[in-house]
A protein has these predicted regions:
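HIT superfamily nucleotide-processing domains
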Residues: 1-91
Length: 91
C-alpha cells in the first residue's frame, strides 16, 4: 500500500481464490485507461509485492491478473481495479 494505490483482499473466496484481491487507485478512476502514469507505476510496484507475499504464503501454481473495463467488459463497479488471484491445482 502507498499513497496512490492499495491492495484489498477479498476474504469471501474459498479454495484456490482465498486471499485473492484487487489493487485499486486511491483516487477515483473509472477504468485502467484513466490512471495517471504515476498510478500505473505504483500499481505494478505493488503487484510485485503482492506476488512476493502470495508466493511466500501460499506457493501458488499460477496467477490470474486482469482488468475489467466497461459494462460489456465485465466491469460491475466503476472504479478501476486490478484483480490478482492466486491459483493452485486441486488434485
Amino acid at each position: 500500500m502507498d499513497d496512490l494505490v492499495w491492495f484489498v483482499r477479498d476474504r469471501r473466496y474459498q479454495g484456490s481464490l482465498k486471499h485473492s484481491g484487487v489493487i485499486i487507485p486511491v483516487a477515483h478512476r473509472e477504468t485502467v485507461f484513466d490512471l495517471t502514469g504515476a498510478e500505473v507505476a505504483a500499481t505494478f510496484r505493488l503487484l510485485r509485492r503482492v506476488k512476493a507475499w502470495m508466493d511466500a504464503e501460499f506457493s501458488p501454481d499460477g496467477y490470474n491478473v486482469g482488468w475489467n473495463c466497461g459494462r460489456v467488459g465485465g466491469q460491475e463497479l466503476f472504479h478501476a481495479r486490478l484483480h490478482v488471484g492466486r491459483r493452485k491445482w486441486i488434485r
